[in-house]
């Protein structure tokens, strides 16, 4: 086996590992979405919107506590996760992942434009 053959095999092995990692990640994401869908179906959209509001309030409190030094980063991250789970359910209900992503891209681009204008002053 030549050195080039070895490198070619190594590249294929690395590519295969990347594919396996990506497939594993997709499966985990799919299982998470199935769970979120099951929760949404069980409780219904009205109850889950109320739960989203509750989780947002808890996130605000955790954010205040984190900024003030009276609450931990771990608690703040937990509340972020709670809100993200609820937001994922909303996107599932409205079949709106693509639309939400589009709006997010627009808002990030707009804010970057604002930052650029601020820096030019």
Describe each model-derived feature in a short phrase:
Residues 10-121:
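Flexible "arm" and connector segments at domain edges
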Residues 1-12:
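Feature marks short, highly hydrophobic, charge-poor N-terminal signal-anchor/signal peptide-like helices
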